[in-house]
Swiss-Prot record, chain A:
It is an enzyme of class 1 (oxidoreductase). Its main location: membrane. Its EC number is 1.1.99.22. The gene is sldB. One of its GO terms (cellular component) is plasma membrane. The keyword Nucleotide-binding does not apply. One of its GO terms (molecular function) is glycerol dehydrogenase (acceptor) activity. Catalyzes the oxidation of glycerol to glycerone. Also acts, more slowly, on a number of other polyols including D-sorbitol, D-arabinitol, D-mannitol, meso-erythritol, adonitol and propylene glycol. It is a multi-pass membrane protein. It is found in: Cell membrane. It comes from Gluconobacter oxydans (strain 621H) (Gluconobacter suboxydans). It catalyses: glycerol + A = dihydroxyacetone + AH2. Keywords: Cell membrane, Membrane, Oxidoreductase, Transmembrane, Transmembrane helix. This is Glycerol dehydrogenase small subunit.
């Protein structure tokens, strides 16, 4: 049963932890990615970092939008990596393996985020 | 480009010129005037007058070695041997027929099987069909491994030889033994009591040499001898039958090879390869520890009478017309290119092929003499009668990348234009360029092109060569120049880290000039391409087998001030503390304006290389039909490798760094260990398919060999490990055979 007043379930806590992880990854992408872009390297990281940070923040706010921002960044990552290295499994490994694993976890949080959103809406209307 | 060039100039002006001025005492004698802000460039010098004289004031940097005229430290003459006398090379007696000239079909009579060093055995009991049944026949323990309190500097790298009833080998610390080839039982062992302090970068003994005397009659002691060069610079001859020292050789069976080398300390200079005997002349080379000081002991090559051990000649690069031993307080000219790879003898032409390395202080070339610049990182064919070069073929001009040649030259015949075979020599290099030369005159048989290289570079007064040689007739044992998209990792996080590392460094390909303002990427690095494992060649099928590395380095020159802060000091500095380890070549380069920092191009937090796999490859090249690649694939699985040094256990053939060569047999099987997955493999010579593999008790960083005993074929590999390759060290020689032939 969803609890009503403040105290969170384990899945909600895990969702928040995931949000923090995504914010940290996103910040690294933005900061180090800006460095890389200024050195003349790929601009992918700094671009991708922005939706990651935003997605993490929205997840912390209990908003489903956060998960979708992450999944959008993941889709962008796949498109970019296929453009950069083609269908080469060895080269797709660092680019997509970790982000996709994280993406599966993020997808699993969508029901949790929905529940949090619903609860907030309910609380808002009571 | 313009911006970075400007930055480089500014950085050089601010960082480099002060130490340059401080070292101006090495300006050529007679140049006069006050210290200048630049060092003499190539061709500006007057040969050996670069080297400090006895009256040169001591260097002013915080750390520095003693004057080259200082006496040798205690223990450098390890066995306190008296000086050896000289004799006229014309008095060398006619050489008896040697086992290595035409070994019995079941023998392995020299480091690379025979005088050709092809690493080819005519044995054929083991085939691609039955290789998967190979089992351990016996294991022999050499007894040499790091004891408690000793830094792990071990990598035995040993290849036994087999002649008649004996398997002869050395331990990593040069003890010599004869084993029963069928059982591994020790027949004799000669301990030479080498000290731990004598170990230079690595405790290695690649092998011993079998020599048959023409002066001692058959049946008498020392008719057949085992010759060995040691880490502590002795040339030792023992009786092949008993292991006793040959009293008639040198001083009671030993020659002190530190004679004439001048100031040194234990571990600075050492021998790790079996010395070849050519027309009765035993030729010795030695490694000089990289990166220590410009005026390190000489890289001189010397010939001795294989019968008496008497000195015959020296090839001292900066004394080209003086082949005698130095007398009194004199020494062979210092800092000259050393040669640490195994040399190859050629009795028919009376030549020894010397693969040379670099002048001392590998990464700074402004203080090298024109004579040194002609012969560094080259194949030098020395006449064994005189010690003079007959020809020189250079593989890198003015090398500042440690692309010294680690491989042994392999002799074979190439089809000539008129159908007559041409005596040829295959010289693999760390660059992955394999040169095929006519061994009569050193002229390329397959085309070699001089191609433009980045020049003049960024270090003032030390311009790079405008061109470098490329062997365009042979498939390159390398991958294309690195790109940012080649950066790898477990995740985008470490990949991003490596991309930044890539972009922060100078990189304009294989000959990126060294820089002090920021790091530069060196690919191929000092680990190869092809390193000391060399190549194997099957003269029946015309197939050449080469294994090679894709292990870039991340290097940076540092100012003298920074080098002092980092505590970089030469090994003969009084403050030097032995132990070191780490990457080879990190060093003070005392006597030059710079020190050098050498690291693998890796993510230092995960210990994973920054570039994408594979990191090691094996290639078969058809030498008879247009030098085409027959097959090529990654060598080594991820089973013993992974992030943070953790073994992943994955059977994925990722291609690991590899050290050590291959053997090819008439049975159509290639044997190779080398990879850091600690396995030995049998590979089908014609298809490249791995038909058998077994896990070794230590890293297989050695050249395997194969021989026959009691009518059956055996395959031996020293699983000695390698400290820098981070594979487990063991003292075990593991010998395999098909079932029912266990010892």
């Amino acid at each position: 049963m969803p609890n009503t007043y403040g105290s969170r379930t384990l899945t909600e806590w895990l969702t928040l932890v995931l949000g923090v992880v995504i914010i940290l990854v996103g910040l690294f992408f933005v900061i180090a990615g800006a460095d890389l872009a200024m050195l003349g390297g790929s601009v992918y990281y700094v671009i991708c970092g922005i939706p990651l940070v935003a997605g993490g923040v929205f997840m912390l706010m209990g908003r489903t939008l956060g998960a979708f921002l992450y999944l959008g960044a993941l889709a962008y990552t796949w498109v970019w990596s296929l453009w950069e290295v083609g269908f080469s499994p060895v080269d797709l490994l660092p680019r997509d393996f970790g982000p996709t694993l994280l993406g599966i976890l993020v997808a699993l949080t969508i029901p949790v985020l929905r529940r949090m959103e619903t609860r907030r809406t309910l609380r808002g209307t009571v | 480009m313009r911006r970075s060039h400007l930055l480089a100039t500014v950085a050089c002006a601010t960082l480099a010129c002060a130490p340059l001025a401080a070292n101006a005492q090495f300006a050529p004698a007679g140049s006069g005037g006050s210290p200048t802000s630049s060092v003499p460039g190539p061709g500006n010098g007057s040969g050996n007058s670069f080297e400090p004289t006895e009256n040169t004031p001591a260097a002013k940097s915080r750390f520095s070695g003693p004057s080259p005229y200082a006496p040798q430290a205690p223990g450098v003459n390890a066995a306190n041997l008296p000086d050896i006398g000289s004799m006229d090379p014309n008095d060398v007696p006619q050489m008896a027929p040697q086992q290595s000239a035409s070994p019995a079909s079941g023998d392995w009579a020299a480091y690379g099987h025979d005088d050709s060093q092809m690493r080819y055995s005519p044995l054929s009991e083991i085939t691609p069909q039955n290789a998967d049944q190979l089992k351990v026949a016996f294991v022999y323990h050499t007894g040499s491994y790091p004891r408690p309190g000793q830094t792990n500097k071990w990598a035995a790298e040993t290849t036994p030889i087999k002649v008649g009833d004996g398997l002869y080998m050395c331990s990593a610390q040069n003890d010599i033994m004869k084993l029963d080839p069928a059982t591994g039982k020790e027949i004799w062992r000669h301990n030479i009591n080498e000290k731990y302090e004598a170990i230079p970068y690595t405790a290695a003994c690649k092998g011993v040499t079998y020599f048959t005397s023409s002066q001692v009659p058959e049946g008498q002691p020392c008719h057949n001898r085992i010759l060995e060069g040691t880490l502590d610079m002795r040339l030792i001859a023992v009786d092949a039958a008993t292991g006793n020292l040959c009293e008639g050789f040198g001083n009671g069976g030993q020659v002190n090879l530190m004679q004439g080398l001048g100031e040194s300390v234990p571990g600075f200079v050492s021998m790790t390869t079996p010395p070849p005997v050519v027309n009765g002349v035993v030729v010795v080379n030695h490694e000089v520890l990289d990166g220590q000081r410009r005026w390190a002991p000489s890289g001189v090559i010397r010939g001795y009478d294989a019968e008496s051990g008497k000195f015959l000649w020296a090839w001292d690069v900066n004394r080209p017309n003086d082949h005698s031993q130095p007398t009194g307080n004199n020494h062979y000219s210092r800092g000259t290119p050393n040669s640490w790879a195994a040399m190859t003898g050629d009795n028919a032409l009376g030549l020894v092929y010397v693969p040379t390395g670099n002048s001392a202080s590998d990464y700074y070339s402004a203080l090298r003499s024109p004579e040194e610049n002609k012969v560094s990182s080259a194949v030098v064919a020395l006449d064994v009668k005189t010690g003079s070069p007959r020809w020189v073929f250079q593989t890198v001009h003015k090398d500042v990348w440690d692309y010294d040649i680690g491989s042994q030259a392999t002799l074979m015949d190439m089809p000539g234009q008129d159908g007559q075979p041409v005596p040829a020599l295959i010289m693999p290099t760390k660059r992955g360029q394999t040169f095929v030369l006519d061994r009569r005159d050193g002229k390329p048989i397959l085309p070699v092109e001089e191609r433009p290289a980045p020049s003049p570079g960024v270090i003032p007064g030390d311009p790079r060569s405008p061109t470098q040689p490329w062997s365009t007739g042979m498939p390159a044992l390398r991958v294309p120049d690195l790109k940012e998209t080649d950066m790898w990792g477990m995740s985008p996080i470490d990949q991003l880290f490596c991309r930044i590392k890539f972009r922060r460094a100078n990189y304009t390909g294989e000959f990126t000039p060294p820089s002090v303002d920021k790091p530069w990427i060196e690919y191929p690095g000092y680990n190869g391409g092809s390193d000391w494992g060399s190549v194997s060649y099957d003269p029946q099928s015309g197939i050449l087998i080469a294994n090679w590395n894709i292990t870039p380095m991340y290097d940076q020159l540092v100012t003298r001030k920074k080098a002092d802060e980092l505590g970089l000091m030469p090994i003969d500095d009084p403050n030097y503390k032995p132990g070191g380890g780490g990457a080879e070549g990190n060093g003070a380069m005392d006597g030059t304006p710079y020190g050098i920092v050498v690291t693998p191009f890796w993510d230092q937090y995960t210990g994973m290389m920054c570039n994408r796999p594979p990191y090691g490859m094996i290639t078969a090249i058809d030498m008879e039909h247009g030098q085409k690649v027959l097959w090529q694939h990654p060598l080594g699985t991820a089973r013993a490798n992974g992030p943070w040094g953790l073994p992943t256990g994955l059977p994925w053939e990722i291609g690991t760094p590899n050290n050590g060569g291959s053997v090819v047999t008439a049975g159509g099987v290639v044997f190779i260990a080398a990879a850091t997955d600690n396995q030995i493999r049998a590979i089908d010579e014609h298809t490249g398919k791995v038909v058998w593999s077994a896990v070794l008790p230590g890293g297989g960083q050695a050249n395997p060999m194969t021989y026959e005993a009691n009518g059956h074929q055996y395959v031996a590999i020293m699983a000695g490990g390698h400290h820098f390759m981070m594979t487990p060290v063991s003292d075990q020689l593991v010998v395999y055979a098909l079932p029912d032939h266990k010892g």
